[in-house]
Amino acid sequence: MDVTWTVKYITEFVGTALLIIMGNGAVANVELKGTKAHAQSWMIIGWGYGLGVMLPAVAFGNITSQINPAFTLGLAASGLFPWAHVAQYIIAQVLGAMFGQLLIVMVYRPYYLKTQNPNAILGTFSTIDNVDDNSEKTRLGATINGFLNEFLGSFVLFFGAVAATNIFFGSQSITWMTNYLKGQGADVSSSDVMNQIWVQASGASASKMIAHLFLGFLVMGLVVALGGPTGPGLNPARDFGPRLVHSLLPKSVLGEAKGSSKWWYAWVPVLAPILASLAAVALFKMIYL
């Protein structure tokens, strides 16, 4: 199937919006006062984010389903995605995250108005390390703990994501085919070869489905295992876009308990996943490609 880059940008927007609807929607259901699942199991949030990654991947994986600026940058830095489309992808992802968050606010507004905890309200938008107790003396500890947590979780996510989408077709075979085509004068990259295999190879649909299921359960596992300190981050668009929405919406929408958007912490869930992605994709490429 031939897909234009414009369609890919739109798909990244839609996919990221779905991620936020499923993921932050689950957080809102648990954190906001008066909801059906208020103060219930953290597993609800794990399932929300797992499905939030899995469903766009299953629905749009044959077009594009990166839905994460850190992953896009990691792939581009390792030569697995064209730099010419990185900015457009990231813009689409951030806007998609903002749109998805606005839909969550629309649905949950009565419960935002009931909630008296400003951190609970912010937590339905973006992440914050639990070391923070709203005093300046805890900011350094929250920043360090948050950065370590985000880096570790993101590294595992991105290494697993690249592995899941490459190993099924044999990374050595992809490298051999790329080199062969270049030797024949073709201007191709490993990502070009891999994309064509995903579309054309016999049994590709089954392999892609397995990979997408794996990614969903991987995210769910990471949220359950490492979400305790910061909440589910692992994605700059997932944090920055909704945090921006939080800062822009007035108290008439989010309630009188709306507090600070905590921009002092905002660089952590942006930079840590990006650095983790660069390291994870580079390591995978060094070992397997």
Swiss-Prot record:
Listed CDD domains: MIP (cd00333)
Gene Ontology CC terms, in alphabetical order: plasma membrane
Alphabetized PROSITE patterns for the sequence: MIP (PS00221)
Predominant cellular place of this UniProt entry's protein: membrane
Cell compartments where the protein resides: Cell membrane
Short sequence motif named NPA 1, residue ranges: 68-70
Parts of the chain that traverse the membrane: 10-30, 41-61, 87-107, 151-171, 209-229, 264-284
Entries under InterPro entries matching the protein: Aquaporin-like (IPR023271), Gla (IPR054631), MIP (IPR000425), MIP/Aquaporin (IPR050363), MIP_CS (IPR022357)
Biological process per Gene Ontology, one example term: glycerol metabolic process
Any one GO MF annotation of this record: glycerol channel activity
Ranges spanned by the short sequence motif NPA 2, renumbered to the chain: 235-237
Keywords tagged on the record: Cell membrane, Glycerol metabolism, Membrane, Repeat, Transmembrane, Transmembrane helix, Transport
Topology in the lipid bilayer: Multi-pass membrane protein
Domain comment (free text): Aquaporins contain two tandem repeats each containing three membrane-spanning domains and a pore-forming loop with the signature motif Asn-Pro-Ala (NPA).
Function according to Swiss-Prot or TrEMBL: Mixed channel protein that transports both water and glycerol.
Family as reported in the entry's similarity comment: Belongs to the MIP/aquaporin (TC 1.A.8) family.
This protein's name: Glycerol facilitator-aquaporin gla
